[in-house]
């Protein structure tokens, strides 16, 4: 067979994932902290990028910059003709990125998606008055970022008053470093003695001293030991209590008959002992500051509109204010025209800066579209609560705003929405559908779980609902659900079975009678 060379002409199409397009996709799924860190790195590398201070006025503060009605689906007149992020990016791939972009903040984020600066006090008041946010009148940032001691600092302050020998303090310091956030000690005494070169008796003696520190229960190695330390501090660790603490697995199973036999007490005494146990803290270290926590900053703020609808706004605190300094580019370009290398570097910086600002603009528009559609779909939840949460999936939102499901998935990742009902992750609003028993509207799984939790919380000791009873009640309410699904939801919410709940409720009822 002879070998020969030949030419073949073939035409094909393929999608090329450019670095800029990959960057735009990554920006979509970044949360506020990740985006701030990424922009800080880009500003450090690119001399043409500037971050505008938050207190500096921008064009977004103009009077015509208003909130976004949820009924519009998050689209503006300017963005109505735009499609998906990917289509928009690919259609501009042949254009010069350095053209048509001013250093104006209006090109970074459109006016129609920015909230009024005058709304800030009202939004801040709403945010602080949310459940779990405390009293808005007494809000003080110092209560959250300063003034609180960690568990290790509190224990270290007690150390000089309890141990005088340097060797004992060394052992104590080692034990303090081995504590977890709950105050439990995860260190073997024999290994500790070998590691520190100390006698086993000294290690055990130091641990006994440390277990008398405040808060009571620290340096325990098991839950039973933690409770025993606290009972000893209350002078309540009698033989019956010791037997109860040593058999916590029976208490977890609500096997009160076996506990009465092991502890040698009657039912009345056992109820008193259980009431004493409930007063103890199983995790004594959690009441202390364990580190620096970052507050969750909502990306979207939803508030009631005067016409009865909802206003959806991007949170200005989560918006990166990035500008391109064209004046600096022009000035430097004049002095570097003779140097082709410097000019090429400046042109590349300008292209990267323009693409970044456009990507941030597109990111803001996309978040706005998705959030507005979620608010439109979950209007009943915002008005009535979790019981009216509708079943929703990514495809419904993607079809409504004419985007791909993957784009919606990236937008809802690690993004939060502040609503009159509280602060929620965007993914919270996407729940599976449970059919209706009467061929009506489907029910959200989250709303069904809420109904199950409410029914169990309202049951009495004489009328504890089994899983089959819950199924019957839900079917009467129009929810078609299987018993195994109810059991799965109940276990996911850490709710015990009806047998265990009946034992506990009867014991509590008898305790209340005494």
UniProtKB/Swiss-Prot annotation:
Any one GO molecular function term: DNA binding
Cross-referenced InterPro entries: RNA_pol_sigma_54, RNA_pol_sigma_54_core-bd, RNA_pol_sigma_54_DNA-bd, RpoN_core-bd_sf
Entry coiled-coil feature ranges: none
Pfam families xref list: Sigma54_AID, Sigma54_CBD, Sigma54_DBD
DNA-binding region extent: 393-412
Matches recorded under PROSITE patterns: SIGMA54_1, SIGMA54_2, SIGMA54_3
Keywords for the protein's UniProt record, in alphabetical order: DNA-binding, DNA-directed RNA polymerase, Nitrogen fixation, Nucleotidyltransferase, Sigma factor, Transcription, Transcription regulation, Transferase
Stretch list, region Disordered: 57-83
Keyword match NADP: no
Keyword Heme: no
Locus of motif RPON box: 482-490
CC terms in the record's Gene Ontology section: DNA-directed RNA polymerase complex
Biological processes, Gene Ontology terms: DNA-templated transcription initiation; nitrogen fixation
Entries under NCBIfam families matching the protein: PRK05932.1-3, PRK12469.1, rpoN_sigma
UniProt function note: Sigma factors are initiation factors that promote the attachment of RNA polymerase to specific initiation sites and are then released. This sigma factor is responsible for the expression of the nitrogen fixation genes (nif operon), glnA and dctA for dicarboxylate transport. The open complex (sigma-54 and core RNA polymerase) serves as the receptor for receipt of the melting signal from the remotely bound activator proteins NifA, NtrC, or DctD for the expression of the regulated proteins.
Family from the record: Belongs to the sigma-54 factor family.
Name of this chain's protein: RNA polymerase sigma-54 factor
Gene: rpoN
